[in-house]
């Protein structure tokens, strides 16, 4: 079997739950020919890529798929690019709020996902699933771990991707701005089966 390292984040800001980690927890341990290895990341600048690096060294996965939360869409978003910028609109869970800082000094401005995002989205759309391409993973900790993963694993066989998942109904006053966790998890399973 192939190995998939999949990550999600703890809650941050005003939220008491994070659908990215909820979804990771709800996924089965095996999907298609992937054996899933689950890892929770904290919303803290500067520390979480180290956890990913340790897990990658230990597991030698075929694919690294990181999940984050997106309050701006009910689609599942497959991000195409990570930028070399920390630019927080809100504090992390330790109160840090970096502003206009590079993630890697003198590093490339951006990296593209090594996961074949366009092919995956096209396939999901053919199945009428609410999956879309994202052209920014923001400048918060999602982007930081995505950028550092691509920076460190760009020339390896491991595929690296980032997926933003929508809020859950219990997190919003208007349920039309959210997607039930069961639906998100089912769509993620389809995406993983297609990698």
List each language-model region with its residue ranges:
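Active-site oxyanion/phosphate-handling segment shared across diverse enzymes
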Residues: 134-167
